[in-house]
């Protein structure tokens, strides 16, 4: 949605997920200021907030969460495609949280991008790598 917030809750678990509704997330990825302002208060104490610092100049106001600032759009533009800003953030998330494997994501990309779109695999992998480097 342009000019507002859009959100999606993702539950990662090795056990059966009974209810996918998340009222108090352990992590938040804020790609724009309205999303940060709306969802920052919902993150649990001790949680992690990832901020797209290319667009959001404000800092996380809470001191009971970990804040990670990633210049997603700047990096994506350096790579020549603003559409991979989300992959830059995913790379930072994977590096910081350690609950997903980069190899798993790479396998998914190879599976998803076939035929003429196969050329996008390397771009997306580089975006992941650059995002991860922001956290190291």
Q: Residue spans of the language-model regions?
A:
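Active-site cofactor/cluster-binding pocket
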Residues: 1-136
């Amino acid at each position: 949605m342009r000019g507002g917030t859009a959100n999606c809750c993702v539950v990662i678990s090795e056990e059966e997920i009974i209810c996918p509704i998340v009222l108090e997330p352990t992590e938040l990825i804020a790609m724009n200021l309205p999303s940060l302002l709306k969802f920052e208060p919902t993150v649990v104490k001790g949680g992690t907030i990832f901020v797209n610092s290319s667009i959001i100049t404000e800092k996380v106001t809470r001191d009971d969460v970990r804040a990670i600032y990633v210049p997603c759009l700047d990096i994506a533009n350096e790579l020549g495609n603003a559409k991979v800003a989300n992959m830059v953030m995913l790379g930072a998330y994977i590096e910081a949280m350690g609950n997903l494997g980069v190899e798993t994501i790479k396998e998914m990309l190879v599976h998803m991008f076939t035929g003429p779109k196969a050329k996008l695999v390397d771009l997306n992998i580089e975006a992941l790598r650059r995002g991860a480097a922001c956290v190291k």
